[in-house]
A protein has these predicted regions:
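Radical SAM enzyme [4Fe-4S]-AdoMet core and its adjacent flexible, acidic
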Residues: 1-114, 120-128
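Cysteine/selenocysteine-centered motifs that mediate thiol-based redox chemistry or coordinate metal-sulfur cofactors
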Residues: 138-149
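Short, local alpha-helical segments
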Residues: 118-121, 143-145
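Residues that scaffold the ATP/ADP-binding catalytic core of kinase and kinase-like folds
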Residues: 116, 136
Length: 149
């Protein structure tokens, strides 16, 4: 199999598992992806909160240090991304801007095209049942959504 890896959405309960899980994935030669706990209209959740931010941030910092010890530029980039998640946990901007809606997108089962399914509110760029792809992608509504992401 190719392109198999581990992914973890980090919260208070699993933050201490970050480095051990990374080490397991590394030993198995697999990718390791992270995300911070967040709220999303798609998953009908608005109460996701990281309560112990300093503990979660410390575990992200430990992961960043592990990634920087490697000889892989890809892992160094992931360290930078994870360092940015520390900012995000504290309510600051991420270091890397979100590029969703510019080169990637999410289509729901009803044809609504959105930047992703992880936004707090449903941000629809258009609908493939009523618009052509070019019309939707280049529409004023798509530009409005891109400015929000």
């Amino acid at each position: 199999m190719k392109d198999v890896g581990f992914g973890i959405t980090v919260q208070d309960k699993n933050a201490p598992d970050l480095v051990p899980l990374y080490k397991i994935s590394n030993e198995m030669g697999m990718e390791f992806a992270t995300a911070s706990l967040h709220n999303s209209f798609y998953f009908v959740e608005a109460k996701n909160i990281i309560h112990d931010r300093s503990m979660v941030a410390k575990n992200f910092e430990n992961l960043v240090n592990e990634l920087l010890r490697s000889n892989s530029p890809k892992k160094w980039f992931r360290a930078y991304f994870n360092h940015g998640l520390i900012n995000y946990i504290y309510g600051q901007k991420r270091l890397l801007p979100c590029d969703m809606s510019f080169d990637t997108f999410f289509i729901d089962p009803y044809g609504d095209v959105m930047p992703c399914n992880g936004t707090k509110d449903k941000e629809v760029m258009g609908n493939l049942n009523t618009q052509s792809w070019d019309e939707l992608w280049n529409s004023p509504q798509a530009e409005v959504v891109r400015k929000k992401v």
